[in-house]
Design a protein with these regions (language model features):
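ABC transporter nucleotide-binding domains
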Residues: 39, 57, 127-129, 151
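C-terminal lobe/lid and adjacent interdomain/linker elements of RecA-like ASCE P-loop ATPase modules
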Residues: 4, 10-17, 93-95, 104-106
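Phosphate-binding glycine-rich loops of NTP-binding sites
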Residues: 37-74, 159
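Conserved, well-folded catalytic cores of nucleic-acid-processing
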Residues: 61, 154, 158, 173, ...
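Nucleotide-state sensing region of NTPase/ATPase domains
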Residues: 63-147, 156-159, 163, 218-223, ...
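Long, charged N-terminal accessory/stalk domains
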Residues: 139-141, 146-193, 197
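Conserved NTPase motor "head" modules and their coupling/switch loops across ABC/AAA+ ATPases, GTPases
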Residues: 6-46, 72, 79, 186-267
């Protein structure tokens, strides 16, 4: 039997098994309750019966959001006022863990672990590791770099607790800088300095995390590809970033004039 190409790779996640899921008013699933196998689960049905929405509910329990629609109010069944997803998991020590998510229209959603509500949703990310595979994943190769960055963000955020915080802070600073760059009048250079410093500070964390992720991924990717190609071909990956051009703050500030000309940051 061929060797498993994933053997002997360093594990970053604890195994979590979904034992049971209950769904109420989630997209076209009005009510459902399923007990699941710890091995392979297959769902059969006609188009439009809710197979993908069931998988999206599982995704929601891991990432606090839908894989397809970022607007939570739109995932509530059209003639209902709320949705609820309940999941019962089992960790490697066979301890049960309950995850609850619910939201009413016009209010914020509530996420709870063992009946205790999270203060911040980012505290939940990484508890239940999950990879969502779909036909749209072809864009990782055929699409632009944004899709590949998104994949890195999804994976890294599940094992690096500070990554989401850095990513959110970077994006906030980026939006503020872009707003200044789009102004008709000359933007306040002192304000630009502030937001560029924020971008550099959080961007360094993001760059280092992505660089380390790619370095971890390369031997796994090569091992799998070698297994698939029977050793006839070799492949590799390389992460290219603006941060590799030098000190990130210097890079951002050097590009200020160019970014001002196009009206947004190119980083």
């Amino acid at each position: 039997m061929p060797a498993n190409p994933l053997c002997n790779t360093h594990r970053l996640f604890q195994l979590m098994i979904l034992k049971k899921i209950s769904i109420l008013n989630f997209k076209n699933i009005r009510e459902a309750s399923l007990e699941l196998s710890p091995n392979l689960n297959c769902f059969l049905g006609h188009n439009g019966e809710g197979k993908t929405n069931l998988l999206d509910a599982v995704y929601y329990l891991s990432f606090c959001r839908s894989a397809f629609n970022p607007i939570d109010s739109q995932i509530i069944t059209h003639d209902q006022d709320f949705f609820v997803i309940d999941g019962i998991y089992e960790n490697e020590d066979h301890d049960p863990i309950s995850i609850y998510c619910g939201m009413k229209r016009g209010t914020k959603k509530h996420f709870k672990r063992d009946k205790k509500e999270y203060k911040r949703l980012s505290q939940h990310i990484g508890l239940i590791p999950l990879i969502f595979v779909s036909p749209a994943d072809q864009t990782l190769i055929a699409g632009g770099s944004e899709e590949r960055r998104r994949l890195m963000d999804v994976v890294i955020s599940q094992y690096d607790n500070g990554y989401i915080e850095a990513l959110n802070s970077y994006n906030k600073a980026l939006q503020q800088r872009n707003a200044l760059l789009k102004m008709d009048d000359e933007p306040d250079s002192a304000l630009l300095d502030i937001w560029e410093q924020e971008m550099a500070r959080h961007g360094e964390h993001i760059f280092q995390a992505r660089q380390e992720f790619v370095e971890r991924l390369i031997p796994v990717f090569q091992n799998i590809y070698r297994h698939v190609s029977d050793g006839h071909e070799e492949v590799s990956l390389r992460y290219v970033s603006h941060a590799q051009r030098g000190d990130l703050l210097d890079v951002i500030q050097r590009d200020r004039f160019k970014d001002r000309a196009v009206g947004y940051s190119l980083h």
